[in-house]
C-alpha cells in the first residue's frame, strides 16, 4: 500500500498560521524556522495590512472586552472597505458579529457628529475593520464555518453594539 502525501502551499499555510496569531493575542507559532506572533492581536493585523503608517485618517482604535477584540480605522488613500473577522480564532467570511460592529460604528459616528449628515455609505467608505469573538456554541450558516449567524458576542456577555457604544 502506497503512503498518501499531502502537499501544502507554503504561502497559504503561512498566511493561515499568521491569521491564527492575529486572532489569538499572545499565541506564538514556530513554523519552518520562523517565529509567528502578533503580541497586539488585531492591532498588529491592522498595522500590517494598511498601506503605510501614514495612511490612516486617525490612529487605529483597538478595543478588547470579555470574549472579543476589535480594531478599526479609516484609510486615507482608499475608499475600499476592508474587513477581517474571526470566531474562536478561525477566520470567517463575515457574519452577525461583523454586521453588529459595522452598525455600532455607523451609529456612534452619526450620533457623535449630528451636525453632519453622514450616510452609512459615507461612514463605511475607506474603513478598515476587524473583529475576533470567542463564543461557546457558535452557530454558522454553513458546515464549513464560513459565516457566523449568532447574535451575541458571548453567551454571558453584552451584545457587541451595546459594548462599543458604551
Which ranges hold each PLM region?
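Short, low-complexity, polybasic intrinsically disordered segments
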Residues: 138-161
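Flexible helix-coil linker/hinge segments at domain or subdomain boundaries
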Residues: 24, 113-116, 153-166
Amino acid at each position: 500500500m502506497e503512503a498518501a502525501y499531502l502537499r501544502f502551499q507554503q504561502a497559504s499555510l503561512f498566511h493561515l498560521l499568521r491569521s491564527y496569531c492575529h486572532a489569538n493575542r499572545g499565541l506564538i507559532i514556530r513554523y519552518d524556522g520562523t517565529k509567528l506572533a502578533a503580541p497586539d492581536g488585531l492591532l498588529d493585523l491592522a498595522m500590517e495590512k494598511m498601506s503605510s503608517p501614514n495612511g490612516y485618517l486617525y490612529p487605529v482604535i483597538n478595543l478588547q472586552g470579555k470574549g472579543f477584540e476589535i480594531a478599526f480605522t479609516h484609510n486615507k488613500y482608499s475608499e475600499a472597505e476592508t474587513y477581517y473577522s474571526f470566531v474562536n480564532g478561525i477566520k470567517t467570511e463575515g457574519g452577525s458579529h461583523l454586521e453588529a460592529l459595522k452598525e455600532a460604528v455607523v451609529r456612534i459616528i452619526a450620533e457623535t457628529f449630528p451636525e453632519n449628515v453622514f450616510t452609512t455609505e459615507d461612514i463605511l467608505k475607506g474603513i478598515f475593520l476587524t473583529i475576533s469573538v470567542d463564543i461557546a456554541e457558535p452557530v454558522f450558516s454553513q458546515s464549513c464555518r464560513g459565516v457566523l449567524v449568532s447574535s451575541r458576542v458571548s453567551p454571558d456577555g453584552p451584545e457587541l453594539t451595546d459594548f462599543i457604544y458604551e
